[in-house]
Amino acid sequence: MSKRESSKYKIDRRMGENIWGRPKSPVNRREYGPGQHGQRRKGKLSDFGVQLRAKQKLKGYYGDLREKQFRATFDEANRRKGDTSENLIGLLESRLDAIVYRAKFVPTVFAARQFVNHGHVTVNGVRVNIGSYRCKAGDVIEVREKSKQLVIVLESVSLAERDVPDYIEVDHNKMVATFARVPTLADVPYAVVMEPQLVVEFYSR
């Protein structure tokens, strides 16, 4: 397990929310943040604080993305026509590691990034080892033949902990997924409320 994967519950504690809906999240047992001072009652956040929190939560959800990478994604969303907040969600959900996670090929977003980085996945028959690779509607994502018997894959597919959203069509017997369409915010099965509009406000200050 990588350091970034082992930090996933730190993100939950920092946010004070079980952002992936995981049964073992420590925030299911307590309502305070990490560290010895976490039990102190938190004061009301300023508008800036609320916006920053929304940004940190969205960054954390997709594997604790680096600020530079997240900002670049936002800038692209802002350049595109339409609602920037919806564009942002669409771009994040189009990431290869996000699709591998949504398809239930692996149990966590962190595991999805590592799985892709280690070369276990193909897109339209071509091996891709970049988690941030952006998929297009109609792309076919498949677990490579030699990787289909990995324990992490078999265990994840067997779990009924989360459903596959309807914008991804999956055949778990063949370990193949099709990215049917780019989703909207309302389509995405977040375990907690995500507020991308606050992220837009944060970067528009």
Curated annotation (Swiss-Prot):
Coiled coil: none annotated. GO terms for biological process: ribosomal small subunit biogenesis; translation. One of its GO terms (molecular function) is rRNA binding. Keywords: Ribonucleoprotein, Ribosomal protein, RNA-binding, rRNA-binding. Residues 1-16 have a biased composition (Basic and acidic residues). PROSITE patterns: RIBOSOMAL_S4, S4. It comes from the Bacteria. Residues 1-46 are annotated as: Disordered. One of its GO terms (cellular component) is small ribosomal subunit. Residues 94-157 form the S4 RNA-binding domain. InterPro entries: Ribosomal_uS4, Ribosomal_uS4_bac-type, Ribosomal_uS4_CS, Ribosomal_uS4_N, S4_RNA-bd, S4_RNA-bd_sf. One of the primary rRNA binding proteins, it binds directly to 16S rRNA where it nucleates assembly of the body of the 30S subunit. Belongs to the universal ribosomal protein uS4 family. Part of the 30S ribosomal subunit. Contacts protein S5. The interaction surface between S4 and S5 is involved in control of translational fidelity. NCBIfam families: PRK05327.1, rpsD_bact. This is Small ribosomal subunit protein uS4. It comes from Rhizobium rhizogenes (strain K84 / ATCC BAA-868).
